[in-house]
Every structure is written in C-alpha cells, then in structure tokens.
Amino acid sequence: MDRTRIVRRWRRNMDVADDAEYVEMLATLSEGSVRRNFNPYTDIDWESPEFAVTDNDPRWILPATDPLGRHPWYQAQSRERQIEIGMWRQANVAKVGLHFESILIRGLMNYTFWMPNGSPEYRYCLHESVEECNHTMMFQEMVNRVGADVPGLPRRLRWVSPLVPLVAGPLPVAFFIGVLAGEEPIDHTQKNVLREGKSLHPIMERVMSIHVAEEARHISFAHEYLRKRLPRLTRMQRFWIALYFPLTMRSLCNAIVVPPKAFWEEFDIPREVKKELFFGSPESRKWLCDMFADARMLAHDTGLMNPIARLVWRLCKIDGKPSRYRSEPQRQHLAAAPAA
C-alpha cells in the first residue's frame, strides 16, 4: 500500500497541467528555443582565418576574472608560458562543460521517458537536450582546435557518470539541484569573463556567448522546476533536501571549477599556489560565494534555509547574501578616494 501511494504521488507530481502560470512559462521557454537557437557548425565559422589557433596568441592569456589569471605566480610567468597555461585551462573548462552536459542530456532523457502524454515539460526538456547536444559538439570542436589533450572532469566523477542520470527518473528534485550545481558555476564564470571586456580569442568569445545565451533558459527552467516541486515535498523530505542542496553545490563546484591533477603536474604549479587559488585567499573565497548567490535566493524563497541548513551552507563556505534577482552582477564596493 505504501509503495502504491508513493508511485501515485510521483505520477501526480509529473502532471503540471493544473498550473497555468507554470505551463505558460514552459511555452515561453519552448518558443524561445525555436526563435533563438544556435548550430555549432553554421553559427561559428571555424575555418575563418580569424578563428585560427596559433602559438603565442596573447588573447589566450587568462583574464583577471579567473582566479589563476589574477594570481602573482601566473603573472610572473613568461608571456609564452602564460599563453600555454591559458590555452590548457580554457580547453579543460570546455571539456568539463561537455562532460557535465552529457550527463545532463542522459538525465533529461530518463526523466522525460516517464512523462504523461500532453506534458508541456516534455517539449521543453527535449528542446534543452537538443541545445545541450549542440553545446557538447561546440565544446569538443574548441578542444580539438586548441589541441590540448585535456581530461575534463576528475576521473572519479567520470567513472560514476553513467549512474548519475539514473537519479532523474525516481528522484527528479535531487537531479535538478545537481543540474543547478553544475550550471551555475560555469555560467557565473563565463559571464564574468565576458563582462570584463578583455580581448579574447574569437573561438572562446563566440563559444562563451552562445553558451551563456542558451544557458539562461536552461537555468530558468531548473529554478522554476524546483520552485514548483519543492513545496510539494513532505516535511521530512524538505529537511533532507535543505541539507543536500549546499553539499551538492559545493561538491560539484569543486569538480567543475578546480583544474584536475594533470594540470598542476603539467605546469609544475606549487602546492601553496593551488591552496590559495582554491579557496584559501579572501578573493577566491568571495569568488566561490558569489557563484551561488542565485542558489541561495532559491533556497530562501522555497523555505530551505532553515537554521541547520544555514550551518551547512556556512561549513561549505558558500554562505552569504542571496541575489535580489537572478543573474544579479556581483560587484566589489570600490573604496572611496581620499580627499585632495
């Protein structure tokens, strides 16, 4: 009897037709995917001379928004070394992105497999899957053009990646929290790079611009999906989800943002530099906290920021003020200039 009740509740949660506002939001996102979408081989002119990847191109030097790019150790390296490190780093970020999106695509396929006929979520999830497939092709083409043999995600996460998408069917709330934990750091980092206005290599600039434009829809869907489902959970489920939320955010952030072991060995980067970069200095800790301002807003708005959850956010070192609105730029307050 209990098992039957659980299955009925699970199926009932899949039906969203009674929520007109949510259905309208899904229609808007789906129409946006039809009107504005990108193809990696028609919207990026890979063979253009402008997109050629050449040695000693200073546009591959890491920007100041990258924690390594603003570190004194990196800035003390020769220009050639900075370029080499920058190319490897950016190629690995792209490889991490395609690994994560491959997991996301498989999870969305598992989730939509169980949807009832007529579900508006089905259409949008398929639109998102198509866009993510294009992103993986785009990221892999960038890696191939750069020519660095980068590993992407840490080995342990690559090993368990076939299992993660299986969560999406029976535990969709946990899965979509994981989706945000992967999408938010990448999106935050790329937006900061584009906002900085530094001269970037055309491949990197175009790939980032396309990814940020389409990822806005994907993150919006994940946020609205959770806003709808979280209030339906039982009190005990909400308690455990409130703890799972920050733990997942921090663990996936580490896997996505921190370069793999091969990077530190390849360029013989001192251990103390790594410790300071991730996340031992005040600047790097602020950068870490800023990534999850939108996630904290979601936790606040859905009642997941209880006293114990606040402690877990603090222990994970990703606590702080929530965003006032999604994608609010996180700016440093400038010190007032001394009077003349």
Curated annotation (Swiss-Prot):
Molecular function GO terms recorded: oxidoreductase activity
Q: Which UniProt keywords apply?
A: Cell membrane, Membrane, Transmembrane, Transmembrane helix
Kindly report the protein's main subcellular placement as a broad class. Answer: membrane
Q: Does the keyword Membrane apply?
A: yes
The record's listing under Pfam families reads: AurF (PF11583)
Q: Topologically, how does it sit relative to the membrane? A: Multi-pass membrane protein
Protein's cellular compartments: Cell membrane
Membrane-spanning intervals of the chain: 162-182, 239-259
Gene Ontology CC: one annotated term: plasma membrane
Q: Which domain of life is it from?
A: Bacteria
Full protein name: Uncharacterized protein MT0908
Record the organism.
Mycobacterium tuberculosis (strain CDC 1551 / Oshkosh)
